[in-house]
Amino acid sequence: MSDRTSSVLGKASHSMIARAPFPHIVIREALPADLYVRLEATFPTKEILECGRPLAAAGRYAYSAASVAQDKRIDPAWRSFFAYHASDAFFQEVVSLFGATIREDHPHLEERLGRKLTQLRTNIRSQTPREDAALDVQFVYNSASLLPARIIGPHLDRPVALYAGLLYLRHPQDHSTGGDLEFWRFKGGRRMFQGGRKSVRKEDAERVQTIAYESNTLVFFPHSAHALHAVSERSPSVHPRLHVNLIAEFPDPIYHLEEGPA
């Protein structure tokens, strides 16, 4: 898995980075076909991902890298995938691709951390001792619902997070509509949050881009006060919505949620 062709960013280049409404990259057929087929066929069962929790309609269940590494029920291809994408080698891929964007959005970050992005020490989230950046990879299982369901509306992720990577693994027999990733921007040049939280009322923002929930599609973007996103309403389905979530985060926020000019 150290081969970059097995990385979700293996096909990425600087020329593929879109700037609006905030910097991001979309890669379709992100993984080699043979690897994707194996990963799709061995995605963990809901029983593994539930971890004994009751299954709720349209509920979200995540299973992180620290647990995957110890779980022999997980296929070796997945454990290798998780190990690489929670490694310093992958973090350096991200910095090589998005370093300039991260520095532009967070001009004082390296000064605060006391190191260049390329020099940051990483480890897997929840492991101790904690390093500069904690990395994680998660299986994410949004359970099926017999009613239309929206997973989450316009919001920003936690301000300690550096980036988000979403690799979609849509079930071949999933004929539902929706469940797509949406990019939004604030209206009227001002950031407005609900009660100081990360969520935003629809009337205070507008949807500007929709990225379809499609198999073997990667969406990757650095976090900032502008990275407003949502998931569209999904039609009833007997199939879960499946993806892998890629995360890096710091102990302290790298931006703030105060209202003001967008």
PLM features: residue spans?
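Catalytic core of non-heme Fe(II) oxygenases with the double-stranded beta-helix
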Residues: 91-260
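Short, Φ-rich (hydrophobic/aromatic) sequence segments
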Residues: 1, 78-85, 164-169, 247
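Non-heme Fe(II)/2-oxoglutarate
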Residues: 4, 14-112, 116
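N-terminal regions that are enriched for targeting/export leaders
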Residues: 2-7, 119
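PAPS-dependent sulfotransferase catalytic domain
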Residues: 6-12, 145-148
